[in-house]
Amino acid sequence: GPDRKRGRQTYTRYQTLELEKEFHFNRYLTRRRRIEIAHALCLTERQIKIWFQNRRMKWKKEHKEEGPAAS
């Protein structure tokens, strides 16, 4: 059956705040920085990477160029 081990990750308020703060300063992380954050927040590098990918997608949607909307 489907692998139940990995459900949707929920982040604590603290983790989210820290990730948002980091994103505010740079939308792309260096590997070194990702490792530091992973250690600081007790998350895996993979989780950090995915969070940033998702956050960038969200950011792009929010900052769409005003123009003809090609849906």
From Swiss-Prot:
Annotated DNA-binding residue span(s): 4-63
Looking up Pfam families in the UniProt record yields: Homeodomain
Subcellular location per UniProt equals:
Nucleus
Q: Name one GO biological process term.
A: anterior/posterior pattern specification
Q: List the disulfide bonds.
A: none
* Main location as per UniProt: nucleus
**The organism's place on the tree of life at top rank:** Eukaryota
What task does this protein carry out? Sequence-specific transcription factor which is part of a developmental regulatory system that provides cells with specific positional identities on the anterior-posterior axis.
Q: Which family does it belong to?
A: Belongs to the Antp homeobox family.
- Known SUPFAM superfamilies for this protein? Homeodomain-like
- Which keywords describe this protein according to UniProt? Developmental protein, DNA-binding, Homeobox, Nucleus, Transcription, Transcription regulation
Q: Show the GO cellular component annotation of the record.
A: nucleus
Question: What Gene3D superfamilies is this protein classified in?
Answer: Homeodomain-like
Q: Which residues cross the membrane?
A: none
| GO terms for MF | DNA-binding transcription factor activity, RNA polymerase II-specific; RNA polymerase II cis-regulatory region sequence-specific DNA binding
Q: What is the designated name of this protein?
A: Homeobox protein Hox-A7
